[in-house]
């Protein structure tokens, strides 16, 4: 098994506490509301929403995938960090065993946030992950993130 790691950074004008509440803690409710074409629904299969919780994410009509299952590996509300692993679903090909994601929000000097994301692709055998596959995923994540940011800017009293 090989592990391929990719890192991404986004910036936002939204401070980390507010962005973490919306983009991480309430994503299961907010994202289907503002981007139903991307995510139709999210449901807890097992657990209470904390570490160890198993969730099924059903994608919207605009997605090339049907659904995925992920497990929450860590939540640190004080340091605005979140990690989970994608463990089942059609986004995992016969070449990928699982994908682990780590996201951390840090304050930027202008009062906003820097969102640092690390993706670890755990492959089956000696398979290599193509850069264009990862780039496409990053572009979708960037678009989704921008939708959340726009929502928060348009609704300044939510997630305070």
UniProtKB/Swiss-Prot annotation:
Signal peptide: none annotated. The keyword Hydrolase applies. GO terms for molecular function: abscisic acid binding; nuclease activity; protein phosphatase inhibitor activity; signaling receptor activity. Phosphorylated in vivo. Phosphorylation prevents its activity as ribonuclease. One of its GO terms (cellular component) is cytoplasm. Pfam families: Bet_v_1 (PF00407). Its EC number is 3.1.27.-. Belongs to the BetVI family. Possesses ribonuclease activity in vitro. This is Major strawberry allergen Fra a 1.04. It comes from Fragaria ananassa.
């Amino acid at each position: 098994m090989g592990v391929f790691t990719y890192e991404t950074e986004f910036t936002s004008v939204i401070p980390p506490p507010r962005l973490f509440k919306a983009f991480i803690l309430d994503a299961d409710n907010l994202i289907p509301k503002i981007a139903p074409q991307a995510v139709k629904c999210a449901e807890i299969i097992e657990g209470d929403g904390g570490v160890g919780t198993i969730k099924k994410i059903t994608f919207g009509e605009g997605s090339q995938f049907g659904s995925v299952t992920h497990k929450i590996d860590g939540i640190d509300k004080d340091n605005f960090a979140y990690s989970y692993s994608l463990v089942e679903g059609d986004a995992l090909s016969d070449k990928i065993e699982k994908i682990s994601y780590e996201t951390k929000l840090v304050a930027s000097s202008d009062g906003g946030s820097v969102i640092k994301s690390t993706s670890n692709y755990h492959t089956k055998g000696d398979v290599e992950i193509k850069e264009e596959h990862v780039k496409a995923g990053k572009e979708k994540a960037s678009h989704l993130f921008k939708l959340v940011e726009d929502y928060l800017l348009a609704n300044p009293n939510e997630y305070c």
